[in-house]
From Swiss-Prot:
Keyword GTP-binding carried by entry: yes
A GO cellular component entry from the record: signal recognition particle
Quaternary data: Part of the signal recognition particle protein translocation system, which is composed of SRP and FtsY. Archaeal SRP consists of a 7S RNA molecule of 300 nucleotides and two protein subunits: SRP54 and SRP19.
Protein name: Signal recognition particle 54 kDa protein
Subcellular localization: Cytoplasm
InterPro entries (alphabetical): AAA+_ATPase (IPR003593), P-loop_NTPase (IPR027417), Signal_recog_part_SRP54_M_sf (IPR036891), Signal_recog_particl_SRP54_hlx (IPR013822), Signal_recog_particle_SRP54_M (IPR004125), SRP/SRP_N (IPR036225), SRP54 (IPR022941), SRP54_GTPase_dom (IPR000897)
Organism encoding this protein: Methanococcoides burtonii (strain DSM 6242 / NBRC 107633 / OCM 468 / ACE-M)
Entry function: Involved in targeting and insertion of nascent membrane proteins into the cytoplasmic membrane. Binds to the hydrophobic signal sequence of the ribosome-nascent chain (RNC) as it emerges from the ribosomes. The SRP-RNC complex is then targeted to the cytoplasmic membrane where it interacts with the SRP receptor FtsY.
């Protein structure tokens, strides 16, 4: 998950509201203090934290609770809205032909982000191409070329040529027929005069529609100074916060965006080419607070899965079979790591509480279930009631497993079957919950 520790701390703070008999000033003050502590530990700017804390307390104690909402839900909604105000709006990078210039310091994850961005446009049906203008860092050309080759993205660069401006000029001519041209510029260990001069010359030649500053999610408080310097030099259209998965604090980068009045365009949430997400403030905060992110989950499923992969409507209408469960497991495997998928489900932050080891064990168990089902007949997959002791023994032998493993699979299947019945019966009214929060 993005910013695991911050998300867990914020969720713990809001739990105090659940146990409170009534929402009074003392309870609100305690919750606000816990939120302050969580944000400051994540490197969020002190001034921003204090402003937000004041707003939460004032609104929670003075605003009238809207009809259909209890006081606890109202305070949670206020926290949700005020956290969104900290991260600000999102920078909208449209899905159309354009030129994008990538800027940032060395080590920010700029080159990897460039390849991920090309993959993002590729997934959306556009034809991206990449120009390597980083002539400063040894290995930059080969790294970016390798990443682009794996994605079948057209690439232009010149090994050993220090003339970055000339490379960009020739690259634009060579790759101009593609929809989205992404120029990866050189980084430095600090914002030096020669880097600024080179960036300004490339900017003049490329005439980019958008300039994206890549900031390392773990950068801390110096992020604001960097963002201001780059903004003064060539201007910033948007920010990409990289390495925001796992333990990254992220608060410094988020503060930098707020202080420079810019906006976040994308966030890096993992190591694979597909782990770059368009930044949506409401969805980001929803995930942090353990409320899930159903919209992103649906979008990910639409991008990754075909209609044949999983037929949710059919499952919701009729019987849920082992064959349906097999399709579910296959679909989840295609959509990415289980940890990312779990964070998108509104499970009250349950996903955030699981350790990486727990996720690994769960993923291994799901793989084992698929192996067991591969040893079943079509008739057994469609009608699990047929699975008596003799069939269970045959399946365990055919899969190299034990009868107990088959019984564990059937127990999991029963649990999933009951969950589907609950969804059909409206026990988990996700839409109602999201509507209450204004999502």
């Amino acid at each position: 998950m993005v910013m695991d520790k911050l998300g867990s701390s914020l969720q713990d703070a809001l739990k105090k509201l659940v146990g409170a008999g009534r929402i009074d000033e003392k309870t609100v003050t305690e919750v606000v203090k816990d939120i302050q502590r969580a944000l400051l530990q994540a490197d969020v700017n002190v001034k921003l934290v204090m402003q937000m804390s004041s707003h939460i307390k004032e609104r929670a104690l003075k605003e009238e609770v809207p009809p259909g909402m209890n006081p606890r839900e109202h305070v949670i909604k206020i926290v949700y809205q005020e956290l969104i105000s900290i991260v600000g709006r999102s920078a909208d990078i449209p899905l159309k032909p354009q030129t994008i210039m990538m800027i940032g310091l060395q080590g920010s994850g700029k080159t990897t982000t460039t390849s991920k961005l090309s993959r993002y446009f590729q997934r959306k049906g556009l034809k991206p191409a990449v120009i390597c203008a980083d002539t400063f860092r040894p290995g930059a050309y080969q790294q970016l070329k390798t990443l682009c080759d794996k994605l079948n993205v057209p690439f232009y660069g010149e090994v050993g040529n220090p003339d970055a401006v000339g490379i960009v000029e020739r690259g634009l001519a060579e790759l101009g027929k593609n929809d989205v041209l992404i120029v990866d510029t050189a980084g430095r260990h600090s914002l030096e005069a020669d880097l600024i001069d080179e960036m300004e010359q490339i900017h003049e030649i490329a005439q980019p529609d958008y300039k994206l500053l890549v900031l390392d999610g773990a950068i801390g408080q110096q992020a604001s100074e960097q963002a201001r310097a780059f903004n003064d030099s060539v201007g910033i259209s948007g920010v990409v916060i990289s390495k925001l998965d796992g333990t990254a604090k992220g608060g410094g980068a988020l503060s930098a965006v707020s202080e420079t009045n810019s906006a976040i365009a994308f966030i890096g949430v993992g190591e694979t080419p597909d782990d770059l997400e368009k930044f949506e403030p409401d969805r980001f905060i929803s995930r942090l607070l353990g409320m899930g992110d159903i919209k992103s989950l649906i979008e990910k499923a639409e991008e990754t899965l075909s209609e044949e992969d999983i037929d949710m409507e059919a499952m919701m209408r009729g019987r849920f079979t082992l064959k349906d469960m097999y399709s579910q497991l296959e679909a989840m495997n295609k959509m990415g790591p289980m940890k990312q998928i779990m964070q998108m489900l509104p499970l009250g932050g349950m996903g955030a509480k699981l350790s990486d080891d727990a996720y690994k064990v769960t993923e291994d168990k799901m793989k084992g279930y698929r192996v067991l089902m591969d040893s079943m007949t079509e008739e057994e997959l469609l009608n699990p009631r047929l699975l008596g002791s003799s069939r269970i023994k045959r399946i365990s032998l055919g899969s190299g497993s034990s009868p107990d493993a088959v019984r564990e699979l059937l127990k999991y299947y029963k649990m999933m079957q009951n969950a589907m019945k609950g969804l059909r019966g409206g026990k988990f009214n996700i839409q109602k919950m999201m509507k209450k929060m204004g999502m």
